[in-house]
Amino acid sequence: RDYYASRGLGDVYKRQGARAGVFHTPHGDIETPVYMPVGTQATVKGVLPRDLKEVGAQIILANTYHLYMRPGDELVKAAGGLHKFMNWDRPILTDSGGFQVFSLAKLNKIKDEGVYFNSHVDGRLHFITPEKAIAIENNLGADIIMAFDQCSEYGADYKFSKAAMERTLKWLERCAAAHKNENQALFPIVQGNMFKDLREISLKESIPYAKHGIAIGGLSVGEPKEIMYDIMDFMLGKYPADVPRYLMGVGSPDCLIEGVKRGIDTVSYTHLTLPTIA
């Protein structure tokens, strides 16, 4: 299936790396570049679905970890999937829950098989494998889903960052094998922390799995913006041209503009809606 078609933006934008395109999903087309409002628990805080449509929102991001914790992916599936559950008939993207497992869950224990962690809600022990993460995302039923990954925090040394990147690649292979739903586009996630050689390896090994899109993870995790932009500059020109690029967790107005200038098609960020309910 041809998921993505690029469109020219003009010479000045081409020189900067920016581009425009259309991403096709079962719930409609998405014109890129695009910002995704974050509906962590299947709702964008303080905003009704009809209001999101009125302001032109094309796609919403929902969080796999939080929906798995409550109300549970099986319940969402029984309700007809996320689109019916949240009364949203446009495209939805779910992350894999990997970032939350490592950042929110207490006492997590990472193994090649998967991750043991205690729920931040009630403390119960859970075990998430790449296959389990895909099964949860299949149940949720989003149009675009992410592979399960290990995100290393800013300041992690080279050895740890390399191990996390290599584990992410192994998990990607397992995610791809487990994913059977042709109506959901699976994106691999590029990791490698702030080490350019690791980023390049991660991207190269992920491209065979990037049939419908690719995500850039592990940025905006505490590093100065100059370092983030430097990594993005380094990656520009190395991405496949025929699929969308999703910059995860980055979407403040200045970062959005800088990302688009560096060839990014899609961004998501919670802080544009959280201040409205403070």
Spans of features found by a protein language model:
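Non-catalytic, usually N-terminal nucleic-acid engagement modules in DNA/RNA processing proteins
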Residues: G10-N181
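Glycine-rich phosphate/ribose-binding loops and adjacent secondary-structure elements
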Residues: A178, E182-L272
